[in-house]
Amino acid sequence: MADHNAHTYFGLRVLEQLPADLLTHVSGDMPAFHLGLYGPDPLIFSLLTKHISDRLHKNWRTESLPGLTKALQKGSATARSFAGGYVLHQLLDDTVHPQIYQWMEEGSSHFRLEIALDLLLLEEKRQANSPKVRTEGKDRTALAAAGMLAPLGARAYLSGLWRMATLSNVFCGPGRPMSAGVRAKEKVQAKELRDRMEAQIAPAARDLEKILVQIPSQADSPRQELLLSRTGRRPAGQQRLADLRRMPAAE
């Protein structure tokens, strides 16, 4: 997705669904987690790297998921956090893109639909301004990303992130140039995308948990057996997530 607010909203909602110990494992570097939520989108903003973004989006389950899984299970705090956010980016795209492509055949715009979804979320949260693209921790995160996402390079990622931040912060958001072009039909369609996104939060948490419970140090522990056999309501990490949001960035 070419804009970022929906991915950030989705990722943080998924974190709230994780048990506290798994939440801690995947959120040790929250700036990296936020950057992971942008997925390969920073690479969209240059003709030199858009083909890499397209490949990473299209083939993420076959080409990227093994490296992401390894990072989630054995990587540093930065690698784990970025990988967690990145997986959630792709899961949300898998949820909404098929519907977006169908509407594109009927005349809607992919870009405008995503802007409409972001604007809808801002309106529902009563936010007057769109949050800026986050760049905290970009250097360490770029190195971690390059280590797990071939053929992505750290320099290309940083360059793309700069373009994404510059263009999004200038042109996107309430009252900005790109927002004015959203059509009435696309605003209605954005509500359906929002509903699809909300419905995917719990399944995405389960998908991420399936990867995390295979952490080697926990592989044969009672904790894993509990997670694998648990039924009913899952422990939530809302308080831990609130604490993480107040913590300074990891260095």
Task: Name these PLM-found stretches.
Residues 1-84, 90-251:
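N-terminal leader/auxiliary helical segments
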